[in-house]
Structures are given as structure tokens and as C-alpha cells.
From Swiss-Prot:
Transmembrane segments: none annotated. The gene is ydiU. ATP binds at G94, G96, R97, K117, D129, G130, R180, R187, D266. NCBIfam families: PRK00029.1. The active site is at D256. Pfam families: SelO. Belongs to the SELO family. It is an enzyme of class 2 (transferase). It catalyses: L-seryl-[protein] + ATP = 3-O-(5'-adenylyl)-L-seryl-[protein] + diphosphate; L-threonyl-[protein] + ATP = 3-O-(5'-adenylyl)-L-threonyl-[protein] + diphosphate; L-tyrosyl-[protein] + ATP = O-(5'-adenylyl)-L-tyrosyl-[protein] + diphosphate; L-histidyl-[protein] + UTP = N(tele)-(5'-uridylyl)-L-histidyl-[protein] + diphosphate. Nucleotidyltransferase involved in the post-translational modification of proteins. It can catalyze the addition of adenosine monophosphate (AMP) or uridine monophosphate (UMP) to a protein, resulting in modifications known as AMPylation and UMPylation. It comes from Clostridium botulinum (strain Kyoto / Type A2). Mg(2+) binds at N257, D266. This is Protein nucleotidyltransferase YdiU.
Amino acid sequence: MKERKVIIKTGLNLENSYTSLPEIFFTRQSPSCIPSPKLAVLNYPLITSLGLNAQVLQSADGVDILAGNKIPEEAIPIAQAYAGHQFGHFTMLGDGRALLLGEHITPLGDRFDIQLKGSGKTPYSRGGDGKAALGPMLREYIISEAMNALGIPTTRSLAVVTTGESIMREAELPGAILTRVAASHIRVGTFEYVSRWGTVEELRALANYTLQRHFKKGYDKENPYLFLLQEVIEKQAELIAKWQLVGFVHGVMNTDNMTISGETIDYGPCAFMDVYDPETVFSSIDIYGRYAYGNQPNIATWNLARFAETLLPLLHINPNEAIKIAENAVSDFTKLYKNNWLSGMRAKLGIFNEELEDEYLIEDLLSIMHKYGADYTNTFRALTFDNIEDTVLFDKMEFDKWYKLWQERLTRQEEAKLSSKQLMKSSNPSVIPRNHRVEEALEAAVKEGDYSVMEKLLDALSKPYDHSKEQDYYSKLPEPSTCPYQTYCGT
């Protein structure tokens, strides 16, 4: 690897504090060499926020770094080890096709993981080729950037490069590498891994590292590991509520895809719901609906219980006391989630203050939407219109009854009607990454090499709360189909 190390002024300021952990947590590994990398897409706003050099990154040397052909001098590429419950079944995992180059320290002192996804085989590849296809990498780029614009914590996509290789999946597909940026890649599955195969001291080392990386206030607490558990529960309660509020279906909420930082990660089989239905499932492998839209809060609770189990040796010297502490902490999730969800739903309806009856008002609207197969995003968007009478949402009599109750509710707050409208417009996106529009962009890019469709889509998705006429095209529903939209993990 030494001959591939280079000094190129990309602006990357890399450290790798993760390698200070015991070696059970990672394996040092070089990326595979790529025959003819070409830049497909580069995230200029993210480059600016990270303090990187766009001109160098889009040069031949920069593209070689994004492809893994050249390695920044200060980088220590590693594949991270972790485990996870996949559809409820525990298994050993790890980075099977990704390498962490290091942690970039921004000019403001913030720390972000820089990871190459699709960079070749690792000791954790489990028989896979370690490669990634262009379509799924572009899809992650689109969805993660849309999530960021919606204000939802997420990993980001810095770039996608094509590799010049063909890889075999369901067919022969063009290869690609995505550069992912994350607060960290520490997962519930990382803790599960060390809990199963490591020592208590190695578990403590990971917990202490996580506190130092994400929750420094925990050091001053009487029980820092309880603080760690509570903070992760709070972050996940906020995150899952935000997913539900925009109709996002993750599709593969395995414990290895739940981050400790509270960011959304892994955009393989995800999609946004069109017609409101709590049983919405997009993933082709989720045949029993374990990860359906309406079940996401329950699965989050289940995942957090698995996280709490890993911390038992650190929570209390007495195992029975440790279990009680963990159970009490996890039981808080439901209330925390519901408070976040209700607060977000009130905002979507222009409600500033709290009343006990609000939940009934919200549930009544959702029930009507479900009954009439209404589009989730466009229904809330229509409620922001001044002339809502011109928009036929459901059965007129049923909707009029609900609408009257809603208008009466708005009178029981001090804020003016204009303020309510502004709150609604800032809480209800006019555009989301509609599945048919995403597929349209991917088909043009992958099959025709035309990235203009994707660029226009990304531009619209970058301003989801603008409510402009230009976004009307992206808010239109797909044509009715007898075949439901399905997603695939892309691996």
C-alpha cells in the first residue's frame, strides 16, 4: 500500500481514532485497484461544508483518491467488524465492501468518517465480490441528499465514481464506488459484535470511545453507560419520528443499520410512501412486513433492547439490577417517540400549542387518508393551500367534518392564521424523492450516461419546502400500476 500513498491537497485532514480501539474491531485493508475510474457525480455543497477542495477532487488525482487507487498519506484504510440481527436472526457481518479511510476534521473542528463503498473484498465479504453497482450507489446519493434537505439526520454522499468494471448481479452492471460521509459508523451491531465475541474490557473500550466521540457529557454522569443508552434512545426516537412524518420506509431496519449517532444509514431497499398505508412495504425480501412503515417504531424499540443487552455488564455489577436499569431506559422510547411524532404532526397541521384531543384529530385525518387511498405527502401539502376547496381530497362530507374540527382547533391558539400557514409550509415538503422519478433519473444515468435528469431531480429535492411551481412535476403521482413498486438491497 505504501506506493499508493500520496500527498494531494484535497483538503482532507484525516485522522483515524478508531484504530486506537483493540484490533478485534477492525482489519487493515487496502482498496482494490480500479482500471479506469471516472467521476459520475460530485457533491459541491457538501465539499464546501467540509472545507474540501472541489477543483482537486475533480482532477485525475482526486478521482483516483475517490476510487481508492491513491490513498491520502494520513489515511489508514480499515474494514470495520460488526454483527447484527437481520430480520430477527443474529449473524456475524462487518464491512464486506467498504473501507474507512479515516476521519476528516473540518476547519470548524467537526469529525466525519470518510468511507469508500464498493472498494473491493475484505475479510468480512462472506463470499461477496466487494463491489457495488452504479444504480444503487446513485440511488443512495439521491435519497441521502433528499433526507438531508428534509432535515433528517443522515449519512451523506460526497461522490460517486464509475470503475470501468462490469459486475454480476441479476445481470451485468456497471461498477461504481460511493464516498460516504458519516458522523461515525458505530452501530448497534458493533456493540453486539463485541458483546458476543469480545471481552468486557473491549466492550468498555468501545463504550468509552463512543462517549468520547458522540456524548462527551456522559463522563460527568454517575453512570456514564446509562447516559450512553439514554442518549441513543433519545436520538433514535427523534429519528424514527422524522421518518414517519415524511413517509419514509427504511426497508431493512436490522440492528447493523441502526447507528449510535442517530443518523439514517443504508439506503438499499428504502423508498417513500405514496398512498398512505401503515402496512406499506417496498423491500422485495420483507415478505412478512417486519419493516413495514407502521412497524418502524416497534422495530426501533426491539433494536434498542438488543443494544441495551450489550451494555448490561457496564450498567451495574449486579446482573438483575443491570436488567432493571436497561428495561426502564428502553421503556422510555415509546413515550419519547410519540412526543416527537405528535409535535411534528401538530406542526404539519399548523398547530403551535398542545391539547389532549390533538392525537384524535391527527388519527382521524390519517384514518380518512387510509380509507380513500390518499397520497400522504400531497394531502398535507394540499392543506397548506389557500383555496383548499378546489382540491378534492376525499369524500367531501367526511372531509368537511374533519376540516371543520381542524379549523376550530386552530382558533384555540394565539398565533395568527398566517403563522400557522408558514409553520405548515416549513413542515410539509412539496417534493419528496418519488419512486418513479428516482427510477427515471437512474435509468437515464445508468443506461444512457445522461446525468441531467438526476441533476434536475437533485435540484428540486434540495428545496423541499419551497412550494414552487417548478416542483409540480416532481409532486405528481405515478401512473396506476398492477405491479407494486419493489426495492432491492443492491448488494
